[in-house]
A protein has these predicted regions:
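Consensus positions within tandem repeat domains that build extended binding/scaffold surfaces
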Residues: 1-5, 23-28, 46-49, 68-71, ...
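A structural signal for leucine-rich repeat
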Residues: 5, 73, 95-96, 116-119, ...
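Structural signature of tandem-repeat unit edges
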Residues: 7-21, 31-44, 53-66, 76-89, ...
Length: 149
């Protein structure tokens, strides 16, 4: 927990293959952190793990199952994120505060989606008729449908 919290000089990290969990607030307010290389086998990204970091792209491994509350809160440089299909839980405010985020793509139905996972200005790309679609309708998020495959 808080391993590199507020380490303002940190710009890039290559996480070792044995890392299966990123603890709460591990890279909290690492304002210059632009690049993170996540290992396959990573299961959970903790609460506020990358709060207020500067990543422009986010490539999560397919092994990720849990995005905890505010994991990428105020990551203002992200513009588009496509979530891996094995994510079971997307906790509240995961990508909220990312003012440049335009699209969050969710191509599957997670077991749980928390409130306010994105800002109102962003949209969620999903399949029509999915649980994610229903979540968007109930929460008032703009939806962009993925063409059937």
């Amino acid at each position: 927990k808080d391993a590199f919290s507020e380490c303002v000089e940190l710009k890039e990290i290559l996480l070792p293959p044995k890392v299966t969990e990123i603890e709460d607030r591990a890279f909290y307010r690492c304002k210059d952190l632009k690049s993170v290389h996540f290992p396959e086998g990573l299961k959970r990204i903790g609460r506020e793990a990358f709060y207020f970091c500067s990543m422009e792209t986010l490539k999560l491994p397919e092994s990720v199952e849990i995005l905890d509350e505010k994991a990428f809160f105020k990551c203002t440089w992200l513009t588009e994120v496509c979530l891996p299909v094995h994510i079971r839980r997307i906790e509240k405010w995961v990508f909220h505060g990312g003012n440049r985020l335009k699209v969050l793509e969710i191509r599957h139905d997670p077991e749980y989606i928390g409130e306010w996972i994105i800002n109102r200005a962003a949209r969620i790309r999903c399949y029509q008729g999915s649980k994610v679609d229903k979540y968007c309708q109930e929460s008032g998020f703009t939806v962009e449908y993925i063409d059937g495959e």
